[in-house]
Amino acid sequence: MKRVFTAAFLLSVCLGFINLTGQEAKPAITTEDYTKWQNLGSAAISDNGKWISWGIRYVDGDDSLYIKNTDTGKVFGYAFSSTVSFSSDSKWASMRIGYSEKETEKMTEQKKPVRFKTRLLNLADGTEKIFENVESFYFTRDASHLIMSGYVGDKRTRDLFLCHLSSGRVKNLGNISESAVNKAGNRLAYIISAEDKKGNGVELLNLADYSVTFLDNDTALYRSLVWEREGNALAFMKEYKDTAYTEANYKLFTVRNISTKPDIRAFSPAGSQAIPEKMRISEAYRPVWSKDMKTLFFGVYTWTPKPVKAKSGTSAADAKLPGLDIWHWKDDPIQPRQKITYNTDNNFTYLFAWNIDQNSVIRLTDEELTRGMITGDGKHVIAMNESLYRPAFREELYDFYIVNTLTGEKKLLLEKFPMISGTSPEGRYAIYFKEKNWWLYDIYKGQHINMTAQVPTIFWNTRDDSPKEVKPPFGTSGWLKDDKGFLANDEYDVWRIPTDGTKAVRLTAGKETGTIYRITRLDFEDNFIDPLKDMYFSAFGDIDKKSGYYRIPVKGKASMLVYDDKSITNLAKAKNTDQFIFRSETYSESPNLFLTGYAFTSPVKVTETNRQQAEYAWGRSELVHYKNVHGQDLQGALFYPSNYEPGKKYPMIVYIYEIRSNMLHRYTTPSVRSSYNTTNFTSQGYFVYQPDIVYRENNPGLSAVECVVPSVEAVIKTGMIDEKKIGLMGHSWGAYQTAFIITQTELFSAAVAGAPLINMISMYNEIYWNSGSPNQNIFETSQGRLREPWWDIMEEYMANSPMFQARNINTPLLVAFGTNDGAVDWHQGIEMFTTMRRLEKPYIMLVYDGENHSLAKKENQLDYTKKVNEFFNHHLLGTEPQEWITSGKKYIEKRREEDKVKK
């Protein structure tokens, strides 16, 4: 079998034999050093491009925030701070002030509320104000105010603090249950909910002079303030009650002509023929404005009559209900799913439209057409029938209808179809993927149009190897302004598909170079892409793993702005200037921010994270090319041990999931709470290898063997690996493959599997408890890649199940589960435990009480990371085994340890 390495890979191996004599080797990092390391958090750039902010999170969990002036280099730094925002005039910054991780843990243990502060920073002189007990905050669009919301008190209201930025004055509004600022930032709407209810109402505050317009007041409660998108109209709801019913009903209010003389309209369901009897306007659906402000959409649902009091003489025992769930084979969805969706189902609403000027109400969804998607202009709704093709054991299918919001007229759009991808911003088109092409439905003309039949490329996702009936597309990247077209992706490129029937245009040229281009949105204010503005694209080398950004300017030649053997991501632009920031990293270069101008000629490093790394030995990463047993070209990311010495053989740990070679340039911060951490292992003298896996239908486990084994053998041939000291590990799907691979080969000397699937038949019949849905769909249409139910292809299920091949295992296996795992039930681990125990084969299972699919508790993260290291170090490095490895731990010993801690 032929293994293929690139020339660059082989050359790097050869160059590794050049000894740099005279240089003292740097020490490898130890677990005591881990707390020195930082993670670069989210970043932002002010609208004028003069200020950049970024977060730093240390390994111990504490946050810091930095703000830097791009002209002077001046830096503000703050501990335990996060969530920064800049005012639109770039004169101010605000941020959340929190606590250290230890303080937060202490308050949580003492059941004290964790309440944050807000810092307001004057960027010109560095002066600041601190505001206590602030839950959320934001600058108004016109940069006149910082608006802060306090925490909800016992009366379900909060204080609202309005800080006038130029004067520093703070206005306090009390008893506020809800507030919202319009887009321009000059008007604040708020709801007052006073304790005695006499002062309840909705008011509109002019932020320029603090004059107040009273929109409505009553002893009733109000809710659901909703501004129209441009801030020119407001809607809200007013509660009223009927003693015959359990829930409140609501009146709708709209306020238009906000800037002149407010035009206030109201609709009451009381006595209205438009609202069916025993139904009410529901608070669960926040009203939605149409684009022209002529229609308000709202939700309606059943109004529950108050229960009739029990007749006298009825005993309490008779009134008690059994603690019973009835699982019925006709249930759709099944009981666990119904429990998960209870709140959603309980707040379900039917969609109605209030046409304000005509004061008419139209019902848009009902018991048959249950859900609706409002089009961009609000003149139509795409409604779906969810019940016709259920239960859906594979892909879910629906009938879709177009409903006119003025007349209620319904027209069939698509029958027995999986999904509508969306509608255009102006509301003319619905877009969907059918027969491997993108289609539009012209709502105005009532026509279906195949938009890509003549485009010389493939839009369906050829990389999707799941057993779906219909392959999904590579996706779209957005609509053009005025519905003049949309952007569609193929495997490598982005195409502009005009809606006027003219020829499609390929915007990028990635196919020829193996570069994957995708649109990068730098301005999210509009819900469309303006072709009269520069267009930016991310670029990723499918083969060489380079990355960067590409620009198509309005005028001039398209060009690659930055493209390197690094992971270059998170491009952002200052709103009002041509200043850009991006993030750059490799496995050996800590992530940093870079600032650049329009030409991208000389990016300047803004941050310097993890400077201490220079004091320690650090590994490097290289790309491996190989072929699986079927001759498919695949790749893997190989990470060298720190202080690698040419000519010496090293142990290696292989980490698997699906496609992993794209992690080649991902920097990995060491951590005592990260069990599968690449740097943790390279600093201990291991190679770490992450190969790609592709799949054959109905053979997920065997496919993994066919990719992983030849890949590892190819790396062994370099002479750098001690073939008797190779470990294998993975989590979830990677853990399944880990457990299965060791049934087919003795290539590995130890294996670690976190939450593995063990028995594909019993797993097929299990529930995915996190969602409450059966696992069958995952197997037949998704990651499981077993197209049929187990009773139709039982041999394949058994042949790809670790449990049914367990007698072949000779590799020591460490498995971990949480008892509340809602993805892979921990009884999968028990099945393997009892099987391996009966076979008298080495198997250790760590069971973490109360944990879900991934460990969340700090103490458990620390423990699992430690045990994974100890397990591999014993089996691969030959260290003395801990007692838990040789003989486990008795339950009575565990209880005695817990009792000591409690004392």
Where in the sequence are the language-model features?
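Bacterial Sec-dependent N-terminal signal peptides
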Residues: M1-A25
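Beta-propeller folds
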Residues: S12, G22-Q579, E585-P591, L595-T596, ...
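Short strand->helix junction
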Residues: G153, E195, K241-T243, N643, ...
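Hydrophobic alpha-helical scaffolding
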Residues: E283-R286, T341, K484, A539, ...
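Active-site lining segments that contact anionic ligands and/or coordinate catalytic metals
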Residues: A284, M293, G378, E435, ...
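Glycine-rich His-Gly loop
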Residues: E386, F540, E585, Y655-I659, ...
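Cap/lid segment of the alpha/beta-hydrolase catalytic domain
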Residues: Q454-P467, F600, E608-K725, M729-S732, ...
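Active-site-proximal cap/loop segments of hydrolase catalytic domains
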Residues: T668-K903
